[in-house]
Amino acid sequence: MATLSQLVDNLVATTFELDGPRVRIGRHPENDVQIDEISVSSRHAFIDVEPNAYLEGTTDYFISDNNSTNGTFVNDIRLTERQRLNNNDVVRIGWNIFRFVDEDENTLEKTAFILEE
């Protein structure tokens, strides 16, 4: 299972498990990942957890901004549409920095495969 780890001075402060199907992120207490900080919108972003279409037993994670005031960024690029998260991506929600970690993807990087048409 993948995680989203909040970083403070490049050290992990808090880790959240992404056990979907949809993980809601924001300031409101009803979110799965609650960030009580002024730069975060009440319903800031969400991560969809979906089975991979090609590799049975693997999972993909897609992040979307939910029309937040200060935006959602992946690797310093502001999201304008849904984006797939990759292992070690850096996610910024308001002024808060997170690292996306997917240990299963890390294992798959060592495996080559050919898709049949």
Predicted regions and their residues:
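Structured interaction and signal-relay segments at domain junctions
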Residues: 9
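Regulatory inter-domain linker segments that are low-complexity and enriched
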Residues: 1-6, 55-59, 96-117
